[in-house]
């Protein structure tokens, strides 16, 4: 465990250094924005925020200072740079179509809650057939599966009974009379 923090330690320190550079003053290798809102890499420059470096170009604004300024109150030349942040709002729009599937899930959950009360009043279904018929459209998919499970065994019972009546030709797909003709 002690080895992991030792490895992550220097990485964190580098990140801290970068964050300090961004928050406190400009760093040589980082990008700067000029008055034309163009992002350019400048090794030595001073931005409007008062960062210190060799070249005195007040037109250049480093991205770090821009980020700090934007949180406070961005200047007019910096505000257009924020507008590209509007696309995330557009990205949120597709998230809205995702909500309708959730609305579909909600109707499904109430039928589940209805299943429990149905089991005790099954004996009452006969006298209350009219109100039950109104509720049946929803539980139809739920009611159909159990009878379907009961039907297959009935069919299996019928098949062995019918097979001796049909004879050996039935397995071939034809009647025993047709089978005798082929022979």
From Swiss-Prot:
GO terms for molecular function: structural constituent of myelin sheath. Pfam families: FYVE_2. Keywords: Cytoplasm, Phosphoprotein, Repeat. Residues 68-183 are annotated as: Disordered. InterPro entries: FYVE_2 (IPR041282), Intracell_Transport_Effector (IPR051745). Disulfide bonds: none annotated. The modification Phosphoserine is found at residues 99, 109. May play a role in compacting or stabilizing the myelin sheath, possibly by binding the negatively charged acidic phospholipids of the cytoplasmic membrane. This is Myelin-associated oligodendrocyte basic protein. The gene is MOBP.
